[in-house]
């Protein structure tokens, strides 16, 4: 058992009381009130300040300076080091989510002690048990299922509730403490892909190779003349000092570049920063790109020398020998390919909702302005045809020769600088099988039917076992963030299928209610760790996330609890190698200092709180070496070049078993798929439903913080043109529904969303009634579990619904 000191319920309530009173009395200015209290305490020299971090999944990490008195966090500040200039060692200022960390630590939803389910999964009925009882139950379940089904039956579920830590890190699965533990006892069923980037990661890999397509650093837009953002919204998704909003503002001011936003929703990255917003129907980006390409080809605005030297498949000259005649991109665009349709602006206007004249103007702007920074966020690809969309958008910088130069980009989202800080070793996984992260529910009910050709299984031809045990660490993806909640609920309620669900978390989330064993985890504030994967554009940094307070109640760090579990499984020495958590951190830090000699000593870093390093090579330019010398620095594609036509995809399209309306194509074409604009299902459900990331939360993290919920209420966005015939007024309670479920939520009537589309931010905590109607605005009641064709990823923006006033 751990020897960690605990905080009592009495102390916990004391620490929460000021925040609770504030939540009732003054929700509008909580941070100002707390600042006055902190100033008074500082004057009396009764506080100390300890460095910590916000380690949620917003795209980076942010330092927090915790004010502590009598083992209680009284106030949270952020980085106060460095400059205000983005390409120097600038201050990494946490957003209001990170600064509300105290409200996460002292939240009424905190898990306080180990618990065991006593009702049905999802009912949230548990009884308190001891740590020894909990770990014994887990050990027995692991032994029983491994003996009966093998290690392939043990699954590490996708979860990003704590990211970037060295010890406290929930994703990717192979880098977690649970992976290290499982590898000590024979391994586990892994997953590949992620809910953020499944389609683009696979799609652009076939274009650029290397497993993950790179982009120029966002700071490099100071060298550009034109910025075109397809669904890229850092002002909400990456809004902190560890994000990119401030960087964009400063870099754009230096370049004076025109910025065009292409998005169904007028997002906060616009908000007056943009020069033009072009609304587009969701899922039609590839049609727009095809029409832009048509104009650029017809008006000789493409970079033919670049296409000839660096690319495969643009025209007949570079088409692979195994491709059919007229199988190249130019033929597809001009209408002498297989479909025989010229991709004119008039053709695209009917699909995208963008007038043909504006398409022509945009094509000329992109084709005649160089360099141009063209990038896509991760929203456009999160669709049923998302792999094709991601590849299509990348065609714009390829056609115009903007790849590998300053001020240009690849069409991918921006990349950033990183430093070689050593990670915690997690040992080798003996299990070879890996499933698409989105198909874990299928792996429960039909695991042994899933194959490489039908379901994208990797490492083996076919799964040998269904999933019988799930580790769910810092994850709300078991229910809340996974699609089609009602189907998942039905699968998980049958505990003869998946026999054990173990959740390790800080709070009683929607997912936690489906657990068999609940283990209360320490927050970042209650343990020592390093926060890694921290960067913004051309600066990387590491945060010393020190232990700010003692663990609350019976909460324990994950390394501590797994060390005891390893002892019950007879592998403690292999798991710990005789080190405590702090001893591991000191060991890793000394290894990191060998790679980064400029790092201070451990104790100096502990006082300093943050280590920053600016890229000595200046702004990042993706594939610059390839552009400078393609023979010496080929891409990691079969041809070594940019593959507009992919022979690998042509082969997959022939051999994989696909649904009739699934499309895998060697070219980045526009293809309709399920629940798209123009689908016959629109007769019943005429509105497209799209999700977006909301500044009130990071996915579902911070979704239970009172002041953030009050400042940013959950609403569905609807255009006045759609609201008027339904007699819906701003603020009305409405029902959104389809065959998969129903949500009741207040409506925001706004011209900031294109007609024919409603938008609902993801991450709201699922709150069903007895009829399965959700009252929180959880979009995943309405999304589908049907995967995308190639990545087998989550198409959570491909939804058709109807909306009615209640």
From Swiss-Prot:
- Grouped into one coarse class, the protein's main location is membrane
Give the bilayer topology: Peripheral membrane protein
Q: Which GO terms describe its molecular function?
A: 4 iron, 4 sulfur cluster binding; dimethyl sulfoxide reductase activity; electron transfer activity; molybdenum ion binding; molybdopterin cofactor binding
**Region called Disordered, residue ranges:** 786-806
Binding residue positions for Mo-bis(molybdopterin guanine dinucleotide)? 163-167, 196, 236-237, 262-263, 283-285, 378-379, 382, 480, 504-505, 693, 699-701, 780, 796-797
Q: Where is the signal peptide?
A: 1-35
Question: Where is the protein situated, by its record's location annotation?
Answer: Cell membrane
Query: Effect of altering residue 465 to P?
Result: In strain: Eagan
Question: Which co-factor is required?
Answer: [4Fe-4S] cluster; Mo-bis(molybdopterin guanine dinucleotide)
GO biological process per UniProt: anaerobic respiration
Q: How is the subunit organization of this protein annotated in UniProt? A: Heterotrimeric enzyme composed of a catalytic heterodimer (DmsAB) and a membrane anchor protein (DmsC).
Instruction: Report the family membership.
Output: Belongs to the prokaryotic molybdopterin-containing oxidoreductase family.
User: What is the protein's given name?
Assistant: Dimethyl sulfoxide reductase DmsA
List the source organism: Haemophilus influenzae (strain ATCC 51907 / DSM 11121 / KW20 / Rd)
Q: What gene, per UniProt, encodes this protein?
A: dmsA
